[in-house]
Amino acid sequence: LGPNVRIFDPSMSTAQIRAVVDQIAAQQVSNEFGPERYALLFKPGTYGTADDPLIVQVGYGTEVAGLGASPTDVKINGHVDVYNQCNANGCIALTNFWRSLSNLTIQIESKGLDGCRASGNFWAVSQAAPMRRVNVTGGNLTLMDYCTAGPQYASGGFIADSAMGFVINGSQQQFLTRENFKLRWERGD
């Protein structure tokens, strides 16, 4: 394995995993053109709890994936989020590229997050950021970040072979979906 591959297993505490993913997020969330790449891989099992959720922010050049045969083999009680990027011109998701999420289940648990962030799992991306074989339960999946400086723009992505209840499209300009189940789509006109 390369030096930037992190493999987690259910015997690790949420605090141990959080320390690693938070350190990577601190480096990668705004590292748009940096050369670093990370893979955060989860062995089959359950991570986080309702009282101590695992919250993962996915930055540039970061892959988050479950290593089970099925998305239900890896369950994260918490969030796996992408938020708007803020700079002198405002807070938007138009350059949230180069990250991915695959082959796991997110049971949304929001203890410790503010009211707006607790409202759902955020995947505010704009292209080159696929979500494949992901189940989202216990809350909404939102494809825009309406918490950081109010609703702002995002510009598309790809979701395939996934199951989720309610999806908030919001300001997304375009999103390609394929073979998704139990999907209820809410536009944000």
Predicted features, each with a name:
Residues 43, 65-70, 77, 104-107, ...:
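Feature marks extracellular polysaccharide-active and adherence modules
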Residues 10-63, 69-81:
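N-terminal extracellular ligand-recognition/capping segment immediately after the signal peptide
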Residues 79-94, 101, 177-178:
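Sequence/structural signature of small/polar-enriched beta-strand/turn repeats
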Residues 3, 101, 131, 136, ...:
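Predominantly polar beta-repeat domains that present long G/T/S/D/N-rich surfaces used to bind, process
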Residues 1-4, 22-31, 67, 182-189:
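Long, contiguous C-terminal flanking segments immediately downstream of a protein's structured core
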Residues 3, 37, 51-53, 59-61, ...:
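Surface-exposed or flexible loop/turn and strand-edge residues in extracellular/cell-surface modules
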Residues 29-31, 47-53, 73-75, 79, ...:
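Short glycine/acidic-rich loop motifs that flank beta-strands on beta-rich extracellular proteins
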Residues 65, 89-112, 127-138:
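Parallel beta-helix/beta-solenoid
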